[in-house]
């Protein structure tokens, strides 16, 4: 029997970190090798299981990957771009695979991820939900059939604490639609409208953002014509849906060579 893959969980006390901890604990194919928080945190040195009401897991929270590099095989990182890029550099230097769920990277950050994928295996996705990745495929079909003659709008909502907008998932949805239609999202995206905007340009893709309460994640892509519209919607009610997908990706990644992958690869949807 193959030994479980050992996970290094970054940001273990964040919202996604806690969901990932639960998902790792429930999955027999993986095990928690180490859990990390930022240097100076008051939780450093505590048992991550005891701290989260799960009982002792014999994993003490660390603050430096270098100190625990022999305790894991794959990193799961849902933190912030600047933190993830630092962890990515560590992964390359130490030949560790990494699953990246962090969003909000600029072009330089994305380029660094692409460069790292020449040396290690990386799963990088804006959304690890199976349902959202099915939506990506549905959007391709809708764009092929309706995209050239409808107005396309993407509306997304998340909790009040989310720091980037639009969400990485919304941008990925826009990329799927734009690519299918042969457009460049950077040129055709419209992020919010205010004042006298003039008539809508049919070739644009609009984005609207909601930040409120404890919304986990809601996305709707609208293809609107005169007299009818099609809306493709995904609503997440628990972060566990993303956490389970990320753990699934980590287990899948163990058998892959170096390269850049996403959840479409993990789910064999390509």
Swiss-Prot record:
Enzyme class, broadest EC rank: oxidoreductase
Residues given in the record as NADP(+) binding sites: 38
Q: In which pathway does it act?
A: Amino-acid biosynthesis; L-lysine biosynthesis via DAP pathway; (S)-tetrahydrodipicolinate from L-aspartate: step 4/4
Q: What is this protein called?
A: 4-hydroxy-tetrahydrodipicolinate reductase
Write down the SUPFAM superfamilies for this protein, in alphabetical order.
Glyceraldehyde-3-phosphate dehydrogenase-like, C-terminal domain (SSF55347), NAD(P)-binding Rossmann-fold domains (SSF51735)
Function of this protein? Catalyzes the conversion of 4-hydroxy-tetrahydrodipicolinate (HTPA) to tetrahydrodipicolinate.
Q: Name one GO cellular component term.
A: cytosol
Which cell locations does it reside in?
Cytoplasm
Query: Which residues does the entry assign to the active site, renumbered to this chain?
Result: 158, 162
Q: From the UniProt record, list the reaction(s) this protein catalyses.
A: (S)-2,3,4,5-tetrahydrodipicolinate + NAD(+) + H2O = (2S,4S)-4-hydroxy-2,3,4,5-tetrahydrodipicolinate + NADH + H(+); (S)-2,3,4,5-tetrahydrodipicolinate + NADP(+) + H2O = (2S,4S)-4-hydroxy-2,3,4,5-tetrahydrodipicolinate + NADPH + H(+)
User: Principal place where this protein is found?
Assistant: cytoplasm
Q: What keywords are annotated for this sequence in UniProt?
A: Amino-acid biosynthesis, Cytoplasm, Diaminopimelate biosynthesis, Lysine biosynthesis, NAD, NADP, Oxidoreductase
Say which domain of life the source belongs to.
Answer: Bacteria
Instruction: State the InterPro entries in the record.
Output: DapB_C, DapB_N, DapB_N_CS, DHDPR_bac, NAD(P)-bd_dom_sf
* Binding site residues for NAD(+): 11-16, 37, 101-103, 125-128
Per UniProt, where does (S)-2,3,4,5-tetrahydrodipicolinate bind? 159, 168-169
Q: Which PROSITE patterns match?
A: DAPB (PS01298)
**What are the GO BP annotations of this UniProt entry?**
diaminopimelate biosynthetic process; lysine biosynthetic process via diaminopimelate
Assigned EC number? 1.17.1.8
The Swiss-Prot or TrEMBL record describes its family as follows: Belongs to the DapB family.
A GO MF annotation of the entry reads:
NAD binding
């Amino acid at each position: 029997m193959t030994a479980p893959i050992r996970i290094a969980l970054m940001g273990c006390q964040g919202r996604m970190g806690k969901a990932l901890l639960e998902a790792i604990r429930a999955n027999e194919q993986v095990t928690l090798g180490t859990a990390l928080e930022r240097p100076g945190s008051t939780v450093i040195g505590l048992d991550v299981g005891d701290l989260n009401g799960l009982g002792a897991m014999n994993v003490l929270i660390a603050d430096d990957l270098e100190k625990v590099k022999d305790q894991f095989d794959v990193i799961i990182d849902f933190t912030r771009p600047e933190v993830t890029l630092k962890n990515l550099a560590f992964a390359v230097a130490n030949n560790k695979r990494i699953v990246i769920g962090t969003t909000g990277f600029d072009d330089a950050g994305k380029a660094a991820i692409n460069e790292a994928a020449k040396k290690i295996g990386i799963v990088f996705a804006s959304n690890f939900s199976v349902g959202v990745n099915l939506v990506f495929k549905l959007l391709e079909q809708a764009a092929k059939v309706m995209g050239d003659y409808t107005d396309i709008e993407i509306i997304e909502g998340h909790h009040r604490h989310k720091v980037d907008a639009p969400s990485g998932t919304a941008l990925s949805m826009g990329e799927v639609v734009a690519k299918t239609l042969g457009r460049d999202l950077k040129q055709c995206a419209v992020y919010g409208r205010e004042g006298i905007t003039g008539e809508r340009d049919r070739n644009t893709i609009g984005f609207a953002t909601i930040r409120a309460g404890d919304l986990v994640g809601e996305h709707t892509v609208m293809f609107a014509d005169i007299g009818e519209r099609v809306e493709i919607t995904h609503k997440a009610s628990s972060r566990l849906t993303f956490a389970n997908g990320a753990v699934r990706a980590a287990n899948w990644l163990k058998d892959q060579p170096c390269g850049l992958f996403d959840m479409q690869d993990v789910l064999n949807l390509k």
